[in-house]
A protein has these predicted regions:
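Sequence-specific dsDNA recognition surfaces
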Residues: 6-26, 39-69, 89, 94, ...
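Short, well-ordered beta-strand elements within core beta-sheets of diverse protein domains
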Residues: 99-103, 144-149, 156, 195, ...
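Hydrophobic pocket-lining residues within nucleotide cofactor-binding pockets
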Residues: 41, 142, 238, 301, ...
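A short glycine-rich beta-alpha junction/loop motif
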Residues: 2, 91-99, 107-110, 122, ...
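A short beta-sheet element
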Residues: 37-38, 56-117, 234, 259-319, ...
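Non-catalytic DNA-recognition/assembly elements of restriction-modification systems
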Residues: 1-20, 144-217, 354-361, 365-401, ...
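A glycine- and small/hydrophobic-rich beta-loop-beta segment
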Residues: 322
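Short coil/turn segments at secondary-structure boundaries
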Residues: 22-30, 50, 127-128, 190, ...
Length: 417
């Protein structure tokens, strides 16, 4: 832990402020400066669906909430603490009701975004929410957050690992969109199209190609803080916009059916959303390696079991085709949104031939597996850190007493060099 130091977030930031707070209904225009809201902020990436725009004049009038590449945007309400870095391809933007963090030279923006999106960061934010009716992450609290910060070089290594994961997932998404959304699949030049659908493709209910398994209902006393109990995949196991969120895993001691077990590579979908933003309901994730026993799915989750469809293609379709944006509109509820699982297999979908499904699977599956492997290694290191850090800070464990073996890439340069 050499070089680590205790800091407040404001001490390593150029500034920490809040996005515009006020009525926006009469400010939106068809084209102009991108205007980000909470629903556009997903873990580690922006979601451009339902992106709003404001005129340049209003953008200049609310200078405090201007964003630039490298800023970290953090959600205040709904899913507080969710964070992403403003990318280089968004040179000019503004926002409402977000915490804006502009890192100083000692803080890697991708590292601090990873901290906020981790189970540690979510717990830290969750313990500092304010408000009675709707809790939110206050900017004053954000400035005073205390963290133990590694040297910039170590931050960069950690951040680069997360960016490799994002890149692999983005590559798989781009291949899917190129082939099955833009219809530039291999052989498309010779294909005959009818009403936008290539000949040989079919429009069928999704249930023709997969079936749905509903999760297990449970009582609060069935959830236990005991790793020996069964891992339990709940609504908390989903990132905003889809994908698996490791920090949300629970443990369960109750009964379940064998079909409610999921294992590595299985596809699950959230059928509940705790907010009205609809950024979790209808979203899919792939189950990572959770051990030989697998995990049980809760009532907020369904399992989609492939029948006549390639499993990797099915996952890509559910994540990246726009199906989630379609199905989420069927969810209803005053405070908590619920989506009836039986509606999902009833939806008509465009299904390409199996040969084309298999072909994209051969390309995308290794990318997804590598991303999952990197994420799992990162989770294991985080678990070790979370277990050791309190003892190191308290002095109960000395760093010089640890036999830590570093890989060659992390070895410090020799004095001779």
């Amino acid at each position: 832990m050499n070089g680590w130091r205790d800091i407040k977030l404001k001490e390593v930031s150029e500034y920490v402020t809040v996005g515009f707070v006020g009525s926006m209904a009469d400010q939106y225009v068809e084209a102009g400066v991108p205007f980000l809201r909470s629903l556009n902020i997903h873990p580690f990436r922006l979601n451009y669906n339902d992106l709003k725009y404001i005129p340049e004049s209003f953008h200049d009038a609310i200078k405090k909430s201007k964003l630039r590449p490298g800023d970290v945007a953090i959600v205040r309400t709904g899913y507080p603490g969710t964070a992403c870095v403003i990318p280089a391809d968004l040179p000019d933007a503004n926002c409402s009701d977000l915490v804006i963090l502009r890192p100083g030279p000692d803080l890697n923006p991708h590292y601090i975004a990873a901290v906020f999106n981790s189970s540690f960061g979510q717990s830290l934010v969750g313990g500092n929410l304010v408000g009675a009716a709707q809790q939110h992450f206050n900017v004053t609290v954000a400035k005073e957050l205390k963290l133990r910060l590694p040297p910039r070089a170590e931050q960069d290594k950690i951040a680069n690992n997360q960016r490799r994961i994002d890149l692999l997932e983005s590559m798989a998404e781009e291949i899917y969109r190129e082939w099955f959304v833009r219809m530039r699949f291999p052989g498309c030049e010779a294909a005959t199209f009818s009403k936008g659908i290539p000949e040989g493709w079919e429009v069928v209910p999704l249930g023709r190609h997969c079936h749905v398994v509903k999760g297990r209902s449970y009582a609060s006393e069935d959830l236990v803080d005991d790793p020996a109990a069964m891992p339990f995949v709940t609504l908390k196991s989903f990132n905003r916009g889809g994908g698996y969120r490791a920090g949300g895993l629970k443990h369960y001691k109750g009964e379940f059916k064998s079909e409610q077990l999921v294992k590595q590579g299985d596809i699950v979908m959230a059928v509940t959303d705790m907010t009205q933003d609809r950024v979790v309901v209808g979203r899919a994730a792939r189950v990572p390696d959770l051990g030989e026993r697998g995990a049980v799915i809760s009532l907020d989750v369904i399992r989609l079991v492939p029948k006549k469809v390639d499993p990797t293609y099915l996952y890509l379709f559910l994540r990246f085709s726009g199906f989630a944006n379609h199905i989420k509109e069927f969810a209803n509820g005053a405070n908590v949104l619920h989506l009836k699982p039986d509606l999902i297999p009833a939806q008509d979908v465009v299904m390409p031939p199996r040969a084309l499904q298999d072909r994209v699977s051969l390309i995308a599956e290794p990318m997804l597996q590598q991303a999952e492997k990197l994420a799992q290694n990162s989770r294991r290191l985080s678990e070790m850190r979370d277990a050791l850090l309190p003892r190191l800070i308290s002095g109960k464990l000395r760093v010089d007493a640890l036999n830590i073996q570093f890989p060659p890439s992390m070895q410090p340069p020799s004095e001779a060099a």
